[in-house]
Amino acid sequence: MATTITMQSSTILGNFILVTASFAVLIILIRVFAWDKITGIFEERANKIANDIDAAEEKLTAAANLVQQREDELVQGRIESQKIIQDAVERAKLEKKRILEQADVEIQGLKQKAQLEIEAEKREAQENLRVQVAELAVDLASKIILEDLDQQAHSNLIDRYLDKLGDK
C-alpha cells in the first residue's frame, strides 16, 4: 500500500509539474506572440468605451442646452403673446372710446337738428295760426259791420267762428 501511495503521489506530483510547466510555457508563448495584440484589443475597447461615454456626455449636455433654449423660447413666446394680447385689448378700448365719442357727437348733432326742426315747425304753426286768426278776425269784423246784430246774434256768430277755428 505504501507503494501505491508513493506512486499516486509521484503521479500527482508529476501531473502537477507537467501542468504547471505547460501553463508557464503557454503564458510565455502568449506573452511573446499574442500579448501585444490582446492588450491592444483591450486598450482599443477601453478607448472606444471612453469615447462613447464622452460622446454620450456631450450629447446629454447638448440636449440639456437645447431643452433650456426651447424653454427660454417658450417663455419668451408667452411673454410676447401676452404683450400682443394686452396691446390688442388697449387698442380695442381706445377704438371703443373713439366710437362712443363719435356716436355722442352724432347724437348731439341729431338732437340739435331735431330741435331746430321742431322750432321751425313750431314757428311755422304759430305763423299759420296767426294768419288764420287774422283772417277770421277780419272776416268776423266784416260780418259784424255788415250786419247789425243784437247781443244773441253776436254771440252765435262768435261761437260759429270759434267752432270753425276748432275744426281747422
From Swiss-Prot:
Alphabetical keyword list: ATP synthesis, Cell membrane, CF(0), Hydrogen ion transport, Ion transport, Membrane, Transmembrane, Transmembrane helix, Transport
Topological category with respect to the lipid bilayer: Single-pass membrane protein
Residues spanning the membrane: 10-30
GO cellular component: plasma membrane; proton-transporting ATP synthase complex
Database matches in SUPFAM superfamilies: F1F0 ATP synthase subunit B, membrane domain (SSF81573)
Entry-linked HAMAP family: ATP_synth_b_bprime
Subunit structure: F-type ATPases have 2 components, F(1) - the catalytic core - and F(0) - the membrane proton channel. F(1) has five subunits: alpha(3), beta(3), gamma(1), delta(1), epsilon(1). F(0) has three main subunits: a(1), b(2) and c(10-14). The alpha and beta chains form an alternating ring which encloses part of the gamma chain. F(1) is attached to F(0) by a central stalk formed by the gamma and epsilon chains, while a peripheral stalk is formed by the delta and b chains.
Primary location group: membrane
Gene: atpF
Family to which this protein belongs: Belongs to the ATPase B chain family.
Localisation per UniProt entry: Cell membrane
InterPro entries from the UniProt entry: ATP_synth_B-like_membr_sf (IPR028987), ATP_synth_b/b'su_bac/chlpt (IPR002146), ATP_synth_F0_bsu_bac (IPR005864), ATP_synthase_B_chain (IPR050059)
Protein's UniProt name: ATP synthase subunit b
Domain of life the protein comes from: Bacteria
UniProt function note: F(1)F(0) ATP synthase produces ATP from ADP in the presence of a proton or sodium gradient. F-type ATPases consist of two structural domains, F(1) containing the extramembraneous catalytic core and F(0) containing the membrane proton channel, linked together by a central stalk and a peripheral stalk. During catalysis, ATP synthesis in the catalytic domain of F(1) is coupled via a rotary mechanism of the central stalk subunits to proton translocation.
MF GO annotations: proton-transporting ATP synthase activity, rotational mechanism; proton-transporting ATPase activity, rotational mechanism
Pfam families in alphabetical order: ATP-synt_B
Entry-linked NCBIfam families: ATP_synt_b
PANTHER family: ATP SYNTHASE SUBUNIT B (PTHR33445:SF1), ATP SYNTHASE SUBUNIT B', CHLOROPLASTIC (PTHR33445)
